[in-house]
From Swiss-Prot:
Keywords: Plasmid. Transmembrane segments: none annotated. InterPro entries: Integrase_cat-core (IPR001584), RNaseH-like_sf (IPR012337), RNaseH_sf (IPR036397). The keyword Kinase does not apply. This is Uncharacterized protein y4rM. Residues 164-327 form the Integrase catalytic domain. One of its GO terms (biological process) is DNA integration. It comes from Sinorhizobium fredii (strain NBRC 101917 / NGR234). The keyword rRNA-binding does not apply. It comes from the Bacteria. Pfam families: rve. GO terms for molecular function: nucleic acid binding.
Length: 350
């Protein structure tokens, strides 16, 4: 039956008949319920829930007995420290070996019951019991920030939209790995430096990613550009983001910036040259050793002036969005030497 009375009236009706309903016998309850459903329009099951006695107190949560108390936790801490703070999954198979040794040397004095608990405790339970002591051992940090992280935080971020037509001398720097199909072991890498204003690009081979060799390659590249370098923009590679390299760049008067992590478009200029120059010229093979490094350097000596003096390239002038379509307009293609009025100073010294 459709509801014919208001909510306030239904509430008053419940208050009027609820005590009589609860104190009646089964037959009378059925008759009262029929009348109540007919008047209010409630579903019969809902009417029963409204009229039946409410529980005086909610059911209490189930209480579980504590199996691994503080004495188990203290013994686990001793085992954890003795194992050089291993994770629980590695510590569990080591407990049968460590436990007799610690008891033999007086570090632990355990009852048979406590000893059995330590031998049967699961790795997940060990994680829960050791969670607080692990936070204290870390000094309250989730993980320790290394020196490279501190150096990275000290270097300001520069995105692809922050350049605003700089003067010649601000370069993006990146590594191209000549590792072939395997990145294991030591292999030659090419340091690529691309000037933002002119597109002038220099490539310097590096035998390993050691910071001293990185500094030597940067210093060598400075002598190859036809204008003085003003700033370097690195990615977040640890070969660049370390105290030695960053401090050297700043001591040379170079402005040091970095791109955002996992945002390759922040270094779009040098990323384009990685493929257009290095990969196109050298390919994807594996190069190893001093002899390969020297040969690669001689190759770059031959092609550097050809690309920078005679190879015209496009440079974006403006970009306009029209609905879902992006329209790009470019300056007329010219070689890097013709951009920015850069004076030609042929540097050597590779």
């Amino acid at each position: 039956m459709a509801r014919r009375i208001s909510m306030a009236t239904r509430t008053e009706l419940v208050e009027a008949i609820i005590e009589r309903y609860r104190s009646s016998c089964r037959a009378d309850k059925q008759r009262i319920l029929d009348e109540f459903v007919a008047v209010t329009g409630y579903h019969r099951k809902h009417a029963i829930r409204v009229l039946r006695p409410s529980e005086s107190e909610p059911p209490c949560a189930r209480q579980y007995a504590v199996r691994y108390g503080p004495e188990v936790r203290e013994a686990l801490v001793a085992l954890w420290e003795a194992s050089d703070r291993l994770c629980s999954k590695r510590l569990k198979p080591l407990i049968p070996i460590l436990l007799p040794a610690l008891e033999r040397h007086g570090r632990l004095d355990l009852s048979t019951e406590l000893r059995d608990k330590l031998l049967t405790v699961s790795a997940a339970t060990m994680d829960r019991l050791l969670s607080e002591i692990r936070v204290v051992a870390r000094g309250g940090q989730r993980r320790r920030a290394g020196m490279s992280s501190a150096v990275r935080r000290s270097v300001p971020v520069r995105t692809f939209g922050d350049w605003n037509d700089p003067l010649p001398g601000y370069v993006e720097v990146d590594f191209v790995a000549h590792s072939g199909t395997s990145s294991s072991g030591s292999f030659v890498q090419t340091m690529v430096l691309t000037d933002i204003a002119t597109g002038w690009t220099e490539c310097v081979p590096v035998r390993t990613r050691e910071s001293g060799l990185v500094i030597a390659a940067l210093n060598q590249a400075r002598s190859l550009f036809p204008f003085p370098l003003q700033g370097v923009d690195f990615d977040n590679d640890s070969a660049f983001m370390n105290e030695r390299v960053v401090c050297w760049c700043r001591s040379q008067g170079l402005e040091v910036t970095r791109s955002r992590a996992y945002r390759k478009n922040d270094q779009a200029w040098v990323e384009q040259k990685n493929g257009a120059i290095v990969r196109r010229l050298v390919g994807y093979g594996r190069l190893v050793g001093a002899e390969a490094t020297a040969a690669l350097g001689r190759l770059y000596d031959v092609v550097r002036l050809y690309g920078n003096l005679f190879q015209p390239s496009f440079k974006l002038r403006e970009k306009t969005r029209i609905g879902a379509r992006v329209v790009k307009r470019y300056h007329p293609p010219v070689p890097p030497i013709a951009r920015g009025g850069c004076p030609f100073r042929c540097g050597r010294g590779r």
